[in-house]
Amino acid sequence: MKSAVGLVAFATVFALPALADEVAPSDVMFNDGVVEASLTGKAGDATAGRDVFANRKLGNCLACHANSEMPEQSFHGEVAPLLDGVADRWEEAQLRGIVANAKMTFEDTMMPAFYIDSGYVRPLDGFESKSILTAQQVEDVVAYLMTLKEE
């Protein structure tokens, strides 16, 4: 029993600093759609971001966007802009704002806000007050998008 309590205490002490750096969805600071500061206080992982981008149950970005960097993925969307060279067109802070809540940049967009926890309709009660992506997943997707440059 002592070791279980000690393990929980240890995990709590080391997990809290990581959570303390994370910006809650309601606290994200947008400046004309731009989010300058990382949502997590650390750099995103482009490889993990690629996985989130392609995952039909997470980002599902390919439902709307085409991306020729992912030829192994089928059924790229044609509704939203092609993402080839997106890192040449937008800065990291702009992409962070677009992924977090595209409506702050493009008022009439159909793109979902991936990092908000209110002001939307969720089809299942279990998803109320929850963002689609975590702060880390947003940072990871942004890191991945920053790799998409023209050749």
Segments from the language model and where they lie:
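Glycine-rich, acidic and aromatic/proline-enriched surface loops and short helix-turn segments
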Residues: 58, 101-105
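The canonical Cys-X-X-Cys-His
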Residues: 49, 57-68, 95, 111, ...
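N-terminal signal peptide c-region/cleavage motif recognized by signal peptidases
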Residues: 15-17
